């Protein structure tokens, strides 16, 4: 199975330019391709994983991928898929974001793993866009773009009524210059991107043809886009409780990351396995059978969560995420270390206490776990209160040093799922 057939079988092709010629081009050549990532934050998020894994799929098929970080275009902001203009970040902020994204991408696509001839190459478009004068921009690029041609592109036409600035209007030309630069310097003949990038990609192809039409060369350049990732329930992919799922462990912990994938809907899980993992067709078919016959076991979700956590983080982070998951399922909170407790209960209500012993009834009221002392006594009496996973029904119980996990936390649970994190005041 060639690379395009594999991508098609996984549902990863939204559009291509001249599919037949592209197929022959890939079969007959070691093709250099690129995908761009603008530094709009200090981390990539899971929406970037499809294009990142696409680079890796092409690499495994013997081609030469380039990961282009938009240190230059990130100063401007892509209007594609947006209803309003982005706020411009300060140059030093964009430079900082660029550096962090380069580090993340290097880790995710194993840039430093070997020195083979198709190792993923990293580039930063600030290297050429940052030094371009306005005269060069208008003479060398602007003259090849008709206004009507640009207005017809969806990224622009969708914004005409709301209004679009010249800054964002020009973004298409800047991205086109990237393709031209990589074509000239790296013999790059394929650009890939999200479905919202189609207009920018085809504009880049047009710039290459027009700027080099007087040269005696056979110009073959192509574009390929991946589909917008959707969810069966209609909610936005890549967010949970309104928060983005980041690839940086300090922004989204490996446990949260694991749980995001583990909670995938049965209707989505096989599609996501095809999109995001490198599992074989045979393995995916077996997992599909599991979803159909034993959905309650969540075998496919577990495999998806394991593959993604291992890929984005590492084996140790995966084991940690699984340990937290098992501890919460079994109620054995005491097996977790301090870091794991912080990961597991990062978003639950918290309360700070001193190191002095505190009566359980008072603690339940002070931490707003129970609404009143009367309610607190009822909760304890009815067996609804757990300290570090163990039920406590003693009205006179005091939370003290032995209950402080790692000398730092006590986890209180009310009922089946309502957790509270009690933080012990640090010794000054």
Swiss-Prot record:
Keyword Protein biosynthesis attributed = yes
Residue ranges of the motif 'HIGH' region = 39-48
Kindly state the positions of the motif 'KMSKS' region in this protein. 236-240
Q: Which sites bind L-tyrosine?
A: 34, 171, 175
Q: Name one GO biological process term.
A: tyrosyl-tRNA aminoacylation
Query: Which keywords does UniProt give here?
Result: Aminoacyl-tRNA synthetase, ATP-binding, Cytoplasm, Ligase, Nucleotide-binding, Protein biosynthesis, RNA-binding
Which chemical reaction does it catalyze?
Answer: tRNA(Tyr) + L-tyrosine + ATP = L-tyrosyl-tRNA(Tyr) + AMP + diphosphate + H(+)
GO MF terms here are:
ATP binding; RNA binding; tyrosine-tRNA ligase activity
Per UniProt, residues of the S4 RNA-binding domain are 358-424
Give its localization.
Answer: Cytoplasm
Q: Which cysteines are joined by disulfide bonds?
A: none
- List the record's Gene Ontology CC terms alphabetically: cytosol
E.C. number: 6.1.1.1
Signal sequence residues: none
**Binding of ATP: at which residues?**
239
What NCBIfam families does its record include?
tyrS
- Outline the subunit composition: Homodimer.
Known HAMAP family for this protein? Tyr_tRNA_synth_type1
Tell me the protein family, please: Belongs to the class-I aminoacyl-tRNA synthetase family. TyrS type 1 subfamily.
Function of the protein:
Catalyzes the attachment of tyrosine to tRNA(Tyr) in a two-step reaction: tyrosine is first activated by ATP to form Tyr-AMP and then transferred to the acceptor end of tRNA(Tyr).
Name assigned to this protein: Tyrosine--tRNA ligase
Q: Which organism is it from?
A: Oceanobacillus iheyensis (strain DSM 14371 / CIP 107618 / JCM 11309 / KCTC 3954 / HTE831)
Lineage, highest ranks first: Bacteria, Bacillati, Bacillota, Bacilli, Bacillales
């Amino acid at each position: 199975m060639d690379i395009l057939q594999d991508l098609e079988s996984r549902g990863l092709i939204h559009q291509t330019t001249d599919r037949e010629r592209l197929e022959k081009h890939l079969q007959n050549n070691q093709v250099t391709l690129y995908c761009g990532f603008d530094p709009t934050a200090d981390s990539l998020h899971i929406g970037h994983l499809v294009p990142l894994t696409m680079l890796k799929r092409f690499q495994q098929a013997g081609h030469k991928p380039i990961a282009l970080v938009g240190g230059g275009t990130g100063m401007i902001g892509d209007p594609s898929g947006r209803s309003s203009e982005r706020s411009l970040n300060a140059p030093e902020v964009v430079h900082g974001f660029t550096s962090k994204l380069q580090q993340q991408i290097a880790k995710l696509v194993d840039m430093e793993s070997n020195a083979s001839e198709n190792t993923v190459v990293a580039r930063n478009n600030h290297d050429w866009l940052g030094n371009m004068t306005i005269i060069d921009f208008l003479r060398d690029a602007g003259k090849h773009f008709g206004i009507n041609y640009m207005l017809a592109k969806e990224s622009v036409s969708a914004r005409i009524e709301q209004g679009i600035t010249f800054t964002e209007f020009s973004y298409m030309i800047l991205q086109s210059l990237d393709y031209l630069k990589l074509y000239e310097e790296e013999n790059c003949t394929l650009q890939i991107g999200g479905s919202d990038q189609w207009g920018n990609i085809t504009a880049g192809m047009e710039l290459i043809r027009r700027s080099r039409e007087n040269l005696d060369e056979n110009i073959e350049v192509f574009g390929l886009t991946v589909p917008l990732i959707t969810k069966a329930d209609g909610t936005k992919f890549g967010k949970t409780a309104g928060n983005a799922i980041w690839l940086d462990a300090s922004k989204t912990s490996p446990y949260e990351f694991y749980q995001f994938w583990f909670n995938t809907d049965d209707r989505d899980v096989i599609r996501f396995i095809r999109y995001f993992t490198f599992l074989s067709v045979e393995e995916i078919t077996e997992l599909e059978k599991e979803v159909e016959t034993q959905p309650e076991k969540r075998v496919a979700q577990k495999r998806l969560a394991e593959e993604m956590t291992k890929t984005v983080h590492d084996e140790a982070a995966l084991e940690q995420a699984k340990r937290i998951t098992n501890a919460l399922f079994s109620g054995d909170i005491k097996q977790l270390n301090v870091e794991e407790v912080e990961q597991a209960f990062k978003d639950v209500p918290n309360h700070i206490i001193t190191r002095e012993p505190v009566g359980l009834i008072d603690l339940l009221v002070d931490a707003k776990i129970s609404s009143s002392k009367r309610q607190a006594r009822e909760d304890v009496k009815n067996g609804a209160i757990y300290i570090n996973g163990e039920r406590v029904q003693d009205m006179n119980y005091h939370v003290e040093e032995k209950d402080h996990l790692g000398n730092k936390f006590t986890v209180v649970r009310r009922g089946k799922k309502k957790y509270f994190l009690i933080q012990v005041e640090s010794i000054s």
